[in-house]
Amino acid sequence: MTSKLDQLREITTVVADTGDIEAVARLKPVDCTTNPSIVLKALGTPMFADAIKEAVAWGKKQGGNPDAVSSAVADRLAISVGAALVKLVPGRVSTEVDADLSFDTEASLAKARSIIAAYKDRGIDQDRILIKLASTWEGIRAAEVLQKEGIDCNLTLLFSKAQAIACADAKVFLISPFVGRILDWYKKSTGKDYTAEEDPGVISVREIYNYYKANDIKTIVMGASFRSAGEIEALAGCDRLTISPNLLDELAKDEGKLERKLSPEGRKPDPKVSVDEKTFRWMMNEDAMATEKLAEGIRAFAKDLGTLRTMVQKELQLAAA
């Protein structure tokens, strides 16, 4: 029998949500996604010990504000993780713009361009990289500009149709609507358990996928943030799914039949609309789940970025001693 992972690969582009080099080499995804949490975890492994030494040595040679230096070294390390992943996948690696820039379009643009330049310095073309931005109004506006410059973007922390509509308006390359974090919110709010078919996160991604296909929107839908293999199976056929290694392993061991749940041919009419800033902000205001999970996600990524910068500061201090 064919594993569910292999069956999934026939209808969906499988992406690994990890910086674990060994897992990527073993599971052979098409793309990889990273975030500050994943980068921090990867840097804790022996594989990146030399990269840390190199980045710290580079940082020692830089002048200026210590906070700016530690931030630059942290960026360099994130690029090191991304560059290692690029060697292992045929497709793209997503690298995230600092979460603390989520409400600053111009600063997000500057950071995104510097990420692309840093990859180019390592001989990696921009068509191998996706710039990952939070799906705030400001992040979406930054993505709109970057797309016009030929820099493809992955809009993350997406919890609502309002965000998906705004991303479509901006003609972004790819969105990452979250599944598991939506489920978390509803389970906490209602005290209920949900089957995969009832899962509010699954329903949200299906609605967004249908809206895009019904209106011939080219933006790729990549479901993200899974709590179970059941959620993944419920979205089989989605353009892409980014999945953690433990769930990829679970699917690889399961030789049951996988049923396709999503296809462009199955789309239902859903009239195309556009959102301006005030409409977007009002729709988000009316969606408590999306508002809370977006804010929570930004805080969590900012916290892990802060942890990475603190680690870098300590390494720089030790190197200077």
UniProtKB/Swiss-Prot annotation:
Disulfide bonds: none annotated. Pfam families: TAL_FSA (PF00923). The active site is at 132 (schiff-base intermediate with substrate). It is found in: Cytoplasm. The keyword Kinase does not apply. It is an enzyme of class 2 (transferase). Its EC number is 2.2.1.2. Keywords: Cytoplasm, Pentose shunt, Schiff base, Transferase. GO terms for biological process: carbohydrate metabolic process; pentose-phosphate shunt. GO terms for molecular function: transaldolase activity. InterPro entries: Aldolase_TIM, TAL/FSA, Transaldolase_1, Transaldolase_AS. Pathway: Carbohydrate degradation; pentose phosphate pathway; D-glyceraldehyde 3-phosphate and beta-D-fructose 6-phosphate from D-ribose 5-phosphate and D-xylulose 5-phosphate (non-oxidative stage): step 2/3. One of its GO terms (cellular component) is cytosol. PROSITE patterns: TRANSALDOLASE_1, TRANSALDOLASE_2. Coiled coil: none annotated. It comes from the Bacteria. It catalyses: D-sedoheptulose 7-phosphate + D-glyceraldehyde 3-phosphate = D-erythrose 4-phosphate + beta-D-fructose 6-phosphate. Homodimer. Transaldolase is important for the balance of metabolites in the pentose-phosphate pathway. Belongs to the transaldolase family. Type 1 subfamily. This is Transaldolase.
